[in-house]
From Swiss-Prot:
Pathway this chain belongs to: Cofactor biosynthesis; NAD(+) biosynthesis; quinolinate from iminoaspartate: step 1/1
Role: Catalyzes the condensation of iminoaspartate with dihydroxyacetone phosphate to form quinolinate.
Organism: Burkholderia orbicola (strain MC0-3)
Compartments, record wording: Cytoplasm
Positions contributing to iminosuccinate binding: 59, 80, 151-153, 168, 238-240, 255
Positions bound to [4Fe-4S] cluster: 125, 212, 309
The protein's required cofactors: [4Fe-4S] cluster
Family annotation (Pfam families): NadA
MF term (GO), any: metal ion binding
Protein name as annotated: Quinolinate synthase
Source species taxonomy: Bacteria, Pseudomonadati, Pseudomonadota, Betaproteobacteria, Burkholderiales
Organism superkingdom: Bacteria
Length: 378
């Protein structure tokens, strides 16, 4: 059973002063600096992080140079929730989030007394854009008998309307547990991840019809052709991808689980169906192996993302240096919303602890080897 709610079009024109659509995001992507400029910017950022007593956390999907900076300065490169948890547990009172807005909000929810900065506050997420809190709340109100489960890729306001928040690495287990208890579910916002979980668990789920711009563009027919070209390659797929892509996967998993799979598999070649930003960490974790991007266009079709999130690409060295220099672009979450939004997050963390499952990994592959035991073939 699926929702009939029409999703918000995330490539629509957006008024000035609000989050930006796809075209506006690509227009705001910083130009690549020269080698000389890059070196100067990195040195400046390191000095500013020290001056501000700040720590940099970066998502796997941002550009490699930002991931390198986070690693080099004692920060963190990870999934969205681990970014927030790292910031919460770190001594620094200023956390700089290189990612998209919901990640900054989640960091603020877990660290309400810390200063959370972002290189560009317009950097958003198509899943967040496609699930406006007003429409979503009305949909939930129309189905009061259902437990509301939302994905991490949502605004603080949507999280505050939920009973549970989940990540891609634990969503399956939580929904299976709810289903075993006879609970009916509203799932938001990603329809592909929701459908994957629904098929695996048999749960009664109403699916909000959102999608990730990047993962929604992966093409099943073209992937099949690419697999024929590289028959020795293992296929790694994020579950936000369409069903005909997920069906061809050797492993379906979260970003960290896919990195772990690249390390643990004996294969020397991998086809990867997630954002290209992850390839930097995969190449570091599994040197000597080859990673091929899954196709996002075919049969004369074009792609809007071409396997790289335009909002993630808005994070650059220059605007990172600027936000540290000026102290602007601070994330604020209404305290009442933040307090309510923390409840579904804490519920997930308590479930993970009770089931001895790590919800997200830290990027430390030695520590996180057990994660891969929870990932099965599609």
């Amino acid at each position: 059973m699926q929702s009939t709610i029409k999703p918000v079009e995330y490539d629509r024109p957006v008024a000035a002063g609000t989050v930006c659509g796809v075209g506006q995001a690509w227009a705001k992507v910083p130009d690549a600096p020269s080698a000389e400029e890059r070196a100067a910017l990195k040195a400046r950022i390191k000095a500013l992080l020290a001056r501000e007593k700040a720590v940099l956390v970066a998502h796997y999907y941002v550009d490699a140079e930002l991931q390198e900076l986070a690693d080099e300065t004692g920060g963190c490169v990870a999934d969205s929730l681990e970014m927030a948890r790292f910031g919460r547990d770190h001594d620094a009172q200023t956390l700089v989030v290189a990612g998209v807005r919901f990640m900054g909000e989640t960091a603020k929810i877990l660290s309400p007394n810390k200063r959370i900065l972002m290189p560009d506050l317009d950097a958003t997420c198509s899943l967040d854009l496609g699930c406006p809190v007003g429409e979503f709340s009305a949909f939930c109100d129309a189905h009061p008998d259902r437990t509301v489960v939302v994905y991490a890729n949502t605004s603080a306001a949507v999280k505050a309307r939920a009973d549970w928040m989940v990540t891609s690495s634990i969503g399956l287990e939580i929904v299976a547990d709810l289903h075993a208890r006879g609970e009916k579910i509203i799932w938001a916002p990603d329809r592909h991840l929701g459908s994957y979980i629904q098929k695996k668990t048999g749960a009664d789920m109403l699916l909000w019809q959102g999608s990730c711009l990047v993962h929604d563009e992966f093409k099943g027919i073209e992937l099949d052709l690419l697999r024929a070209e590289y028959p020795d390659a293992k296929v790694l797929v994020h579950p936000e991808s369409p069903e005909n892509v997920v069906a061809q996967a050797d492993v379906v998993g979260s970003t960290t689980q896919l990195i772990d799979a690249a390390v643990k598999f004996d294969a020397k070649r991998f086809i990867v169906a997630t954002d290209l930003g992850i390839l930097h960490k995969m190449q570091l974790a599994a040197p000597g192996k080859t990673f091929i991007a899954a196709p996002t266009a075919g049969n004369s079709a074009t792609c809007k993302s071409c396997a790289h999130c335009p909002w993630m690409a808005m994070n650059g060295l220059a605007n990172l240096a600027d936000v540290l220099e000026r102290g602007h672009n601070e994330i604020f979450v209404d305290p009442a919303i933040g307090e309510r939004a923390r409840l579904p997050i804490d519920r997930m963390l308590e479930f993970a602890a009770a089931h001895k499952k790590r919800v997200q990994a830290s990027g430390d592959l030695q520590r996180d080897q057990s994660l891969f035991a929870n990932v099965g073939a599609a």
